[in-house]
A protein has these predicted regions:
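Active-site acid/base region of carbohydrate-active enzymes
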Residues: 242-261, 346-401, 431, 435, ...
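The feature captures the catalytic groove of carbohydrate-active enzymes
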Residues: 193-219, 326-333, 369-431, 463-474, ...
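Acidic/His metal-coordination segments adjacent to aromatic residues that form catalytic metal sites
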Residues: 272-274, 279, 315-329, 382-399, ...
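Membrane-water interface at loop-to-transmembrane-helix junctions
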Residues: 481, 486-499
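Terminal accessory carbohydrate-recognition/targeting modules of carbohydrate-active enzymes
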Residues: 1-243, 247, 606-611, 627-699
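Non-catalytic carbohydrate-binding regions of carbohydrate-active enzymes
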Residues: 2-14, 18, 421-470, 474-477, ...
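Aromatic-rich carbohydrate-recognition surfaces in CAZymes
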Residues: 227, 283-379, 400-407, 569, ...
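Substrate-binding groove/exosite segments of carbohydrate-active enzymes
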Residues: 232-347, 499-510, 544-551, 556-568
Length: 699
């Protein structure tokens, strides 16, 4: 995208808003949030992981965050690590035109805001004789992230006379110099004279004081080139996807951007955790949120994935505490996060050098798995207990999703050890994975309304229920607030789907079951039906006990329930489009209790939802577009009736362009190396620059 396009490109068709005379409008005809007159809580967010900026509809930087180090805490079941934050609030710009100062953050003029290329916010401030365009970005240069936010400012003369223009210095303090400002401010360009229709450009950098040397880098660099490079980074991350319904493309990209923006890095480039989403920045790190938000990295951002694996290798297991005992069984799935991400990373990239460089990853993953396996008692099934999922229980004596994670960890490590020629370990974990899968499919299922399906977990005395007494213990009992819909006569009904249990939804992504397997399909269909006690037909989502009318990951499970019904799936996607706020983000809790469809809220208890965004990207890629790697072979099997074009797609170890029609797949290998692609009957070796054509199967 050229700078001219940045200035003059049309307004984003979906994600935009306008403030004029105190009235908020949008050209988005679909979002439920268009009906909310108050813009409180609506933010447009900018991130490169080292820097996070949350801007309001007027363009004020509400909060600018730089990330620091980690520390252990003892507070919530799903939180035992915090990250330190350095923050500054309420930063705004002023311009001077012909001697008059204009405050851009004041609502005394018409303000338009949208997102460029589904990533960076663009503000257009309209005045009688000129307009000011501000594009905010956190620089990503040749994959190097700078610890700063940059605002590129363009002042456009819309009169027949020349204008004297300048951008005023941003105040370094409010009332006295000792006021806390955790930021360095540097400006390029000061004054200019512009003739009719000419443009003056300025740049302001808000720099982390701990990276003070980057101020000089800013002063010596071409900032418009930085903007182009940053936009190009996201263009490469997204690829050029086109579909009959452009709204789905925009929704997908914003979900990927939300996952990306959930994460924090310190100045040294180490991942130090995540937030709920891109807003707000939180000291607390919910490990489970971080895990799901990171799943797209396994496919699209290998360097970030490596750093996330290393973080979970250090912090995945809850340490021994006084409030919570800790240990592997505190949360089985969280304890396995490093092993899971390592498995998915290898599955998509085929890279073994990372594991040779960091041998502790496989050593620690194996140790955790061996400690879990050692718990098994004679006569017990090949299943293992877990207390917590995140802040809610891993329900039952044995929880289905948690044991599924153990299966994926074992299966994935077996593949890695095989390539590393550690064949005895590979064989051991393959055998364990086989036994786990057999136990999960035979013992954690029941004959449901739609056929055989998975339970949330299994009980001890009765398979489909679990006594609430198991949780009526000090501290533990606080988790019962999330279970109000499933407790009957002192028993928890395990024939249900928890809106924050996402691993069963990910079964095809994990390659545990095919998405056409009746066992998987029946489970998803049940989850999105009135037979699931947590499902709400009114809002087409899954409720969250006494806390919230809906939890957003549940909407992704509901989406997958109609994967193979073209029209029904389109209707589910339509609902996700409607639930996206005017910036394109999803909120963790979009509904209050007892709300009607469309009665959405912002910033209700939780922030934006990186968990659901990562889940959406992963399920759409693996199940809808049908892209996956199996033993280094690329498989592409889109759902029936789907047509799309995806040029310059970097997916794991592949760099390809795909054309998908109703009858044929055309795949061009753009990578430097030959690529192995399956056409269901045989494996094709596709050389660089070559295109293959695969006939789509009729089902």
């Amino acid at each position: 995208m050229t700078i001219n396009e940045v200035i003059h490109s049309p307004k984003h068709p979906l994600f935009n808003t306008e403030l004029n005379d105190g009235i908020v409008t949008t050209s988005n005809e679909y979002s439920y949030y268009r009906n909310i007159p108050d813009v409180k809580g609506l933010t447009f967010d900018v991130s490169n992981q080292k820097t996070l900026a949350n801007l309001d509809v007027c363009g004020t930087i509400q909060t600018l965050t730089f990330y620091r180090e980690n520390l252990l805490t003892e507070e919530k079941p799903g939180v035992w690590v915090n990250k330190q934050l350095s923050q500054t609030n309420s930063l705004s710009l002023k311009v001077e035109v012909n001697g008059i100062v204009y405050h851009l953050s004041e609502s005394d003029h018409r303000i338009e805001v949208d997102v460029i290329q589904d990533c960076l916010p663009r503000y257009i401030h309209h005045y009688s004789t000129f307009k000011v365009i501000v594009v905010s970005f956190a620089p990503i240069l040749a994959n190097k992230r700078l610890s700063m936010l940059v605002q590129q400012v363009y002042i456009v003369n819309e009169t027949h006379e020349s204008l004297q223009v300048s951008v005023k210095d941003v105040p370094l303090y409010q009332e006295k110099y000792s006021d806390q400002q955790n930021v360095l401010i540097s400006q390029k360009g000061n004054k200019d004279t512009i003739a009719q229709q000419e443009v003056a450009s300025f740049a302001i950098a808000f720099v982390d004081p701990n990276a003070f040397e980057e101020v000089m880098t800013f002063q010596e660099s071409d900032i418009e080139k930085w903007l182009k490079e940053t936009l190009n980074y996201f263009a490469q991350l997204f690829g050029q996807l086109s579909m009959p319904d452009d709204r789905v493309v925009h929704l997908y990209r914003r979900a990927l951007y939300q996952s990306f923006s959930s994460f924090g890095m310190n100045r040294q480039g180490q991942v130090v955790g995540s937030n709920w989403g891109s807003y707000p920045a939180t000291n607390r790190i919910w490990n489970k949120d971080m895990y799901y938000a990171s799943l797209p990295f396994t496919m699209f951002e290998p360097e970030l994935c490596q750093k996330t694996v290393l973080w979970f290798d250090q912090y995945g297991v809850k340490f021994p505490g006084s409030k919570f005992t800790g240990g592997i069984n505190h949360s089985l799935s969280n304890s396995l996060s490093s092993a899971l991400l390592a498995s998915l990373y290898f599955e998509h990239t085929g890279d073994t050098k990372f594991f040779e460089r960091y041998p502790q990853v496989l050593l620690n993953a194996s140790r955790i798995i061996e400690d879990i396996l050692a718990q098994r008692r004679s006569g017990e099934p090949m299943l293992f207990p877990s207390v917590w999922l995140s802040d809610a229980f891993a329900l039952g004596k044995y929880h289905t999703g948690s044991n599924l994670c153990l299966w994926k960890a074992c299966s994935g490590l077996a593949e890695i050890f095989e390539v590393l020629e550690q064949l005895s370990l590979s064989k051991r974990y393959k055998n364990i994975a086989c036994k786990l899968k057999e136990s999960i499919c035979k013992q954690m299922t029941t004959d449901g309304t739609f056929g055989e399906q998975f339970l949330e977990g299994i009980g001890d005395e009765e398979k489909t229920t679990y006594s609430v007494k198991n949780y009526q213990k000090p501290i533990l009992e606080q988790g019962l607030i999330f279970l109000s819909d499933v407790i009957v006569d002192g028993k928890i009904n395990l024939l249900m789907h928890d809106g924050e249990e996402s691993d069963t939804t990910l079964m095809p992504f994990y390659q545990f079951l095919d998405n056409k397997d009746p066992l998987y399909q029946n489970t998803m269909t049940f989850s999105a039906s009135s037979f699931n006690p947590t499902y709400s037909e009114e809002i087409k989502g899954i409720t969250w006990g006494l806390e919230s009318g809906a939890t957003f990951p549940g909407f992704i499970t509901v989406l997958m329930s109609d994967l193979h019904n073209h029209q029904a799936f389109a209707t589910r996607l339509e609902e996700l489009i409607c639930l996206a706020d005017l910036d394109g983000s999803w909120w963790w809790w979009p509904y209050r209790l007892e709300a009607k469809q469309g009665e959405v809220v912002r910033d209700f208890g939780c922030g934006k939802c990186g968990w659901a965004s990562g889940l959406f990207v992963s399920t759409m890629i693996s199940q809808y577009f049908g892209l996956k790697f199996k033993k280094g072979v690329l498989q592409i099997d889109p759902v029936d009736n789907l047509t799309f074009s995806w040029k310059n797609l970097k997916f794991g170890q592949a760099f390809i362009s795909i054309e998908c029609t109703q009858s044929e797949l055309s795949i061009l290998n753009l990578s430097e190396k030959p690529l192995k692609i399956s056409d269901t009957k045989k494996i094709l070796h596709v050389e660089k620059g070559k295109t293959i054509h695969i006939q789509r199967r009729k089902r």
